[in-house]
A protein has these predicted regions:
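Phosphate-binding glycine-rich loop
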Residues: 30, 35-81, 95-97, 105-107, ...
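Active-site region of PLP-dependent enzymes
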Residues: 164-170, 177-304, 338-339
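N-terminal "arm"/small-domain region of PLP-dependent enzymes with the aminotransferase-like
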Residues: 1-30, 245, 373
Length: 396
């Protein structure tokens, strides 16, 4: 009998569709970025606990704009390195490269799939501008030691919280600790606007820059009349409505995406509680002799069930995948972003790293790590059925 587990189900609910219909039935509506976007940004800021949020068309765009802001504000051009994880989404690395920085890669922990903090600290030097830390799969990647040293060395922290909405460190939501934090609202994430992302900060200048960089670099998007007046006087031969300060593109979202976001945020906390409970039930019933189960759950808010096989046998791995397919269980090998980014073609001409043994943990996850779907509607009975099946497989 098939188990039939997808990576995500029912993430756009009937309630979301009704909210969109209600919005579209209004007599006078604007579909491009307008009041719904502003309201969603305010509600998200309130939920997260930050001063400012900027709604964009994807988490990847949020990443790109954040690093573009760092580049613009960076006055010491000798600081041209940004420390990044080997396990992350491709846009984190590409945002660094496309803005002219050198990515410095760090291996991960099995316990939270985030960067090894000792390795981060070893790689900080005079050239380090920032640490771009991914909170993967709903796990927290921070500790006090890292935060203290980054502050003392004046190294910026950028948080990628795309997969970890609602996860916390010391009871404060992730996304509150960095100079800038980024979120994705892609279909399978904790909150979805189908496609979308958010840039969050407590810094007013960065907020204004994010608004401008979201929209072609246009001055009039800054939402700062005094600043706009000052710049307009500086460029008297330009139309005040068409002054472009930064070399960027259009990353705006729209009113329909914001309407879905406004409806989804109402149930985000309750959905997150279900995800957390699902993950605990999954780990409780999973065979620790065959699979890694010692994850750090403190403050976590699970995005998808991580599976790390203990075996290093490729034949066992292939058998495992064949069995999952036979039960119609959807999976992704390599976990977040497909595994070790250093193995991807886009980096071949940029970095000449051939010795992957320096990154042992991500190498194992690359070949023997997976994630399976976890979502609020997933029933405990199906989780038990899933773990019984996984435990029955001959992969030791």
């Amino acid at each position: 009998m098939k188990i039939n587990l997808k990576l995500m189900e029912n993430n756009i609910s009937r309630s979301d569709i009704i909210s969109v219909k209600k919005f579209l039935n209004k007599k006078k509506i604007i579909l491009t970025q307008s009041k719904q976007v502003e309201k969603f940004e305010k509600n998200w800021s309130s939920w997260l606990g930050v001063k400012y949020s900027t709604f964009v068309n994807s988490g990847s765009s949020a990443n790109f704009i954040s690093i573009s802001i760092l580049k613009t504000l960076n006055k010491n051009k000798n600081k041209n390195e940004i420390i990044v994880p080997t396990l992350t989404w491709v846009s984190d690395i590409n945002s660094v490269i496309m803005n002219g920085f050198k990515p410095i890669f760090v291996d991960i922990n099995f316990s939270n799939l985030s960067m090894k903090i000792d390795e981060i600290l070893k790689k900080i030097n005079k050239k380090t501008l920032a640490v771009f830390l991914t909170h993967a799969q709903g796990f927290n990647g921070l500790n006090d030691r890292l935060l203290k040293i980054l502050k003392n060395k004046k190294v910026h922290l950028i948080e990628d919280v795309c997969e970890s909405h609602g996860a916390t460190y010391k009871s404060k939501k992730l996304g509150n600790y960095g100079l800038i934090s980024n979120f994705s609202f892609y279909y399978a994430h904790h909150l979805s606007t189908i496609e979308g992302g958010m840039i969050c900060t407590n810094d007013k200048k960065i907020y204004e820059m994010s608004r401008m960089m979201r929209s072609h670099g246009m001055l009039r998007e800054s939402k700062n009349p005094k600043y706009e007046s000052e710049i307009t006087k500086r460029y008297p031969k330009l139309s005040p409505k068409f002054i472009f300060l930064y070399p960027t593109l259009n990353f705006r979202n729209n009113e329909i995406g914001a309407t879905i976001g406004l409806n989804q945020i109402k149930r985000l906390d309750s959905n997150n509680k279900k995800r957390i409970l699902n993950f605990k039930n999954f780990l409780k019933n999973l065979d620790g002799n065959k699979y890694f189960v010692d994850f750090d759950l403190k403050g976590s808010c699970n995005y998808a069930f991580p599976i790390i096989l203990k075996t290093k046998n490729i034949n066992k791995r292939n058998y495992f995948e064949k069995k999952l397919k036979s039960k119609n269980i959807e999976f992704r090998r390599g976990n977040a972003g497909g595994g070790n980014q250093l193995r991807q073609p886009y980096l071949k001409s940029i970095l000449k790293i051939k010795n992957f043994n320096k990154f042992k943990n991500v190498e194992h996850v690359h070949s023997f790590g997976y994630y399976l779907g976890n979502f609020p509607d997933l029933k405990k009975e199906k989780i038990i059925k899933l773990t019984k099946f996984l435990n029955s497989l001959d992969i030791r």
